[in-house]
Swiss-Prot record:
Coiled coil: none annotated. Pfam families: MinC_C (PF03775), MinC_N_1 (PF22642). It comes from Agathobacter rectalis (strain ATCC 33656 / DSM 3377 / JCM 17463 / KCTC 5835 / VPI 0990). This is Probable septum site-determining protein MinC. The gene is minC. The keyword Cell division applies.
Length: 243
C-alpha cells in the first residue's frame, strides 16, 4: 500500500486543451517511474479517451531514449496518441496549440486530397526500419517513425505522424504539387516529383533543402516544391492553403 501511494505521488499530470505536462519524481528508479506513469494514465483513461496530444516533461532530466520509452508506455497502455514533445516554458500551451492544430490541418488536407482520387490512401502503423520500403499508388500516412535506411515512395502525398529520418519520394510519377509532412523533419533525402533535396551532410546534392527558419525545437514541418526547389517550412494555415 505504501509503495502504491509513493508511485501515485511520483507522477503528476497537468493538462490543457492541447497537451499534457508530465511532472516526474527526480529520484525514483526509472523502471519504477515507467510503472507509475502507466498506472497514472490508466487511472485517467476515461478523461483522455482517444485524445491526440503534445507532451512535455518537468521535474527530472530525461534522455531522448527515456522520453520515447515513456511515450511508448503511454500509447501501449491507453488510446492516447502523443503527437510531439514540447519543451516546458512560458509559451508551452501556445506551442502545443500550434503543433496540434498543424497535425489536424495536415490530416484534413490529406483527407481532402484522397477524396479526389479513386485509389484509396494507404495507412501504416509502426516504425519503418532500415531496409524497409513502402510504395503506394496514392497517398500514404505513416503512424510512426521512418528510420535511416527506410524509404517511402508514393504517387501522392506523404504524411508521417512521427520522425522522418529516412528517404521519401512524394509525387513519384512527376507530380510537383505533392507534399511531405512530418512531426519531426530530419530526412536523409526528400524527392517531390522530379526534384531531389538531400540533407546538407550528404555530398553534392542536386538541390539543397532550403529552410526559411530553423526551428528552436522539434515541430511539425512540411516539404513543398516551389520554383525548382524543395522547401522545408514550419507548417501554417497559409502554407496548407497554398498547396
Amino acid at each position: 500500500m505504501i509503495l502504491e501511494v509513493l508511485m501515485s505521488q511520483s507522477v503528476t499530470i497537468k493538462s490543457n486543451k492541447y497537451g499534457i505536462n508530465l511532472i516526474l519524481d527526480a529520484d525514483m528508479p526509472f523502471a519504477d517511474l515507467i510503472k507509475a506513469v502507466v498506472e497514472k494514465f490508466k487511472a485517467s483513461a476515461n478523461f483522455f479517451k482517444n485524445a491526440k496530444l503534445a507532451i512535455s516533461f518537468e521535474g527530472r532530466h530525461l534522455s531522448d531514449e527515456e522520453q520515447q520509452q515513456i511515450i511508448a508506455a503511454i500509447e501501449e497502455n491507453t488510446t492516447i496518441e502523443i503527437l510531439c514533445i514540447v519543451e516546458s516554458g512560458t509559451e508551452q500551451e501556445a506551442i502545443m496549440k500550434e503543433q496540434v492544430e498543424a497535425f489536424n490541418e495536415a490530416v484534413q488536407k490529406q483527407c481532402e486530397n484522397v477524396a479526389t482520387v479513386s485509389v484509396p490512401e494507404q495507412f501504416y502503423r509502426g516504425t519503418l526500419r532500415s531496409g524497409q520500403v513502402i510504395t503506394s499508388e496514392s497517398s500514404v500516412t505513416i503512424i510512426g517513425d521512418v528510420n535511416p535506411g527506410a524509404k517511402i515512395i508514393a504517387q501522392g502525398n506523404i504524411v508521417i505522424l512521427g520522425a522522418l529520418k529516412g528517404n521519401v519520394h512524394a509525387g513519384c510519377t512527376g507530380d510537383r504539387s505533392c507534399f511531405v509532412f512530418a512531426l519531426d523533419m530530419q530526412p536523409i533525402q526528400i524527392q517531390i516529383g522530379d526534384l531531389i533535396a538531400k540533407s546538407p551532410d550528404e555530398p553534392q546534392p542536386k538541390h539543397r533543402v532550403r529552410r526559411k527558419e530553423k526551428p528552436a525545437q522539434e515541430q511539425a514541418q512540411i516539404a513543398i516544391a516551389k520554383d525548382g526547389y524543395i522547401y522545408i517550412e514550419p507548417i501554417t494555415k497559409n502554407i496548407l492553403n497554398s498547396i
